[in-house]
A protein has these predicted regions:
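Flexible mid-to-C-terminal extensions adjoining Fe-S/redox cofactors in radical SAM and related proteins
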Residues: 1-5, 25, 29, 262-347
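A general structural signal marking secondary-structure boundaries and capping sites
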Residues: 26, 68, 130, 144-147, ...
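Short, glycine/serine-rich, charged loops/turns that create anion-binding
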Residues: 64, 92, 118, 163, ...
């Protein structure tokens, strides 16, 4: 059996933006008795490194940098063990060159800043905070300046959630990120149902109106835009990836169930293989082979549990293989890489 490629670790559930695609910002950050300690998280990383010394640890949460006491021990340990470490941040915490330099010298192997558009109003609207565009762009510029000063080779990326509000401007968006900002890459993540619990004032489930209003409807135009951009900017996008993106949006369009969010019928066929390469560990030390809670989970309590999970989970994998949930389009779990070149992590 191949070892897991990625270990996704939740380190918090709080955020300082108010993204329309996520409800984490509605929660107050609390420390619960069930949460694993920094030391327990370190033990999990150490065991993962024995499973795959060439693996990658992905720091997850809301805005992970809001908990530096948990963030930096992970990046330092990954550097010590020779593991790759990946981190996506919204840019609000990267406010000066000193911090940018620290990210490049002590932080993850690659740094990704969330950026939803080259148009400030579109980014700010989807992120829920006026001025968040300026903070994200400033973070990218600071990181690039620090990289030049340090003569570092740390990749610096932008990542966007693509939806009705921004996909038609993808050409201009690529131009802005690659030629104006001069970041190394623009990663595309496709809008999925809203993360977190959607409840009305009475505490009852409510419709996923943002997903319904903003998931891309015209999958054929989207496909043509992707073809145009990969040729113009020499992106080397894999044709199978572009077809998967078209299939995902075509499925949502045909199902006519976007308003039901995660209760939708799903894609035409399975497009995810998270179960073959990922382990996700939440704040309570509960491990899964994907982010969905509909499949069995495993509590990591002692040394050896992570290894046992990976090698004994074939019955769970068999349950997961036919899964067609909309989250299969996520860059973290999607079966097909965006680019033809095989990278350590999908883009």
């Amino acid at each position: 059996m191949q070892p897991p490629k990625f270990l996704f670790l939740d380190i918090n559930l709080q955020c300082n933006l108010k993204c329309k695609t996520c409800m984490y910002w509605t929660r107050e950050e609390v420390v619960l008795p069930t949460h694993i300690s920094i030391e327990q998280r370190s033990d999990i990383i150490a065991e993962f490194s024995t499973l795959n010394p060439q693996g990658a640890v992905v720091i997850c949460g809301g805005e992970a940098l809001m908990n530096p006491e948990r963030y930096w021990p992970i990046t330092r340990q990954c550097r010590s063990l020779g593991l790759r470490c990946l981190s996506v941040m919204n840019g609000t915490m990267v406010t000066d060159l000193r911090f940018a330099r620290r990210l490049l010298t002590e932080g993850p192997s690659e740094v990704t800043i969330s950026l939803n558009s080259y148009i400030p109003e579109v980014h700010d609207s989807t992120r829920g905070v006026t001025g968040s565009f300026d903070m994200a762009v400033n973070a990218i510029r600071l990181l690039l300046q620090a990289r030049k000063e340090l003569n570092s080779n740390t990749p610096i990326y932008a990542m966007s959630v693509m939806c009705e509000q921004n996909y038609k401007d993808l050409d201009q968006f690529y131009d802005f990120v690659l030629n104006d900002l001069k970041a190394d890459k623009l990663k595309l993540n496709w809008l999925q149902p809203t993360f977190g619990t959607l409840l009305d004032r009475n505490g009852d489930p409510r419709p996923d109106k943002f997903y319904d209003n903003n998931v891309i409807r015209d999958h054929e135009t989207l496909f043509e835009i992707l073809k145009h951009c990969t040729e113009k900017y020499q992106l080397n996008l894999d044709p199978e990836y572009m077809e998967t993106v078209r299939k995902y949006h075509r499925s949502v369009f045909k199902n006519e169930d976007a308003v039901t969010g995660w209760d939708g019928h799903g894609t035409e066929d399975a497009i995810c293989n998270s179960f073959d390469r990922n382990i996700m560990v939440n704040m309570d030390g509960v491990a899964r082979l994907c982010f969905s809670d509909q499949f069995p989970s495993f509590k990591i309590s002692r040394s050896g549990d992570l290894t046992h999970l990976w090698h004994s989970a074939e019955p769970v994998r068999n349950l997961m293989r036919p899964c067609r949930q909309y989250c299969g389009i996520s860059h973290s779990v999607r079966r097909v890489n965006a680019t033809k070149k095989i990278d350590m992590i999908q883009v």
